[in-house]
Amino acid sequence: MAIHAGFAAEIENITEDVLTLQRDGVVGKKGVFSREFIGRLREDMMTAFWEAIQRPGGAVSRGPRRWYVELHPQAVSGFMDLVTHPWITGMAEAVLGSEYQIVEVGFDTPFQGAKNQPWHRDFPSPKDTYEDHRITSLAFNLTGVDVTPDMGPFEVAPGTQWDDGRSWKHEMFPDPAAWSRYAGLAVRKFPAMGDVSCRSALTIHRGTTHDSPIARPVLVIGVDAPAAGHAALHDMMVTKDYHAALPQSVRERLVCRVVDQLVPITQKHDIEGLVMGVA
């Protein structure tokens, strides 16, 4: 496994990370994977991007010069290292329960010229979250590059995963009159290659203006509690031989179609409110 040297001792107790996630809606871990591993992951993402952008439904706009691409697990050379990593599995099980599901693999890629996104969450909040303060899904993120200030860093407003949101546009986009609150709470994230973050996709966030000529691909692994329902937004596939070779712990959690031959993914999760971006 491509675990950064010296990291193993840090994954024994994740209680503090779970508490941080519950409080802030996001938590990060430094140096989880080697830079060499992330370099291969970046190549996988960019290869997939240039293939996807050439076909309808392959790359979905998340604003000007910003796209989201979903992947089949087999397109990610380090997929098994990712979904069996003890910190990732430990966080998923601690927050979502032992029967958590892997429902999404994809990546977001802003290029030079990408604009600020509106403040948003990735889907409407369920009653379990806005009433009972229970997180029912997680997104694990890994950057493909060392993020610098000109690369449109991710901004997140800690603690906003509990905001109700039922009165918002699409239940995902706060009224612009409330944006100053999120800007006041916002923290800019500057992860390096090898770092992993774990967040609730309900925590209010946005991508920011990207001036660098270097693209900033970020892998997303989406994980659900049973019955959270986000698998319906995605269409992962694996071949029969790949599925049979998976360890049982992954096979029983991976929500996907098992097929004779992979076909390109036509994406289902188009977030209309992000297409135009903001200045």
Segments and roles (model prediction):
Residues V147-T208:
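Double-stranded beta-helix
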